[in-house]
Amino acid sequence: MTQLTREQVLELFHQRSSTRYYDPTKKISDEDFECILECGRLSPSSVGSEPWKFLVIQNKTLREKMKPFSWGMINQLDNCSHLVVILAKKNARYDSPFFVDVMARKGLNAEQQQAALTKYKALQEEDMKLLENDRTLFDWCSKQTYIALANMLTGASALGIDSCPIEGFHYDKMNECLAEEGLFDPQEYAVSVAATFGYRSRDIAKKSRKGLDEVVKWVG
């Protein structure tokens, strides 16, 4: 694999900018979008939990149903090439069947599984206090989905594809709408965040960011 230069890496991030208006005549190829999804699937997550699912919503009727409560992507639902809604796992306790599957994927033997469970219990109960209420535990899983989201956005930029991460919608109504469509079990998952992908239809103003010296503090 040819290694990118530092300049090429940074160019991907300068090039990526939240796209509000897409060209509806330009569609992402199946191969390119599968690559973007793989960027999400291959992302890291806390204790390798992978507490996410990716809903790729291409159905125009469903997108239309989403408009009344999706103010943050009202201009994009008609014109973006692809829409992804990322779900986060609910009730991902260390002693749940979900974590049994996590350990099975890792190929752990019985002794290793018990050691892992002990660590997961300490993490959730003591280190992060995730078991205080259902929302705290869900938010932990939701944080993991943002790692996958970021990698999908950067992967898209590497392919010359534009994107926009979106939180601008009514979460209860979005959950209700998608669950009623049978897209997920609301007892097991809930909406975390969304993103649109496609090709921009107009120029985007140069992004403004804080200087490196404002956000970085070296210690030692």
From Swiss-Prot:
NAD(+) binds at G155, A156, S157, A158, L159, G160. One of its GO terms (biological process) is 2,4,6-trinitrotoluene catabolic process. One of its GO terms (molecular function) is oxidoreductase activity. Transmembrane segments: none annotated. GO terms for cellular component: cytosol. Its cofactor is FMN. Belongs to the nitroreductase family. This is Putative NAD(P)H nitroreductase. It comes from Haemophilus influenzae (strain ATCC 51907 / DSM 11121 / KW20 / Rd).
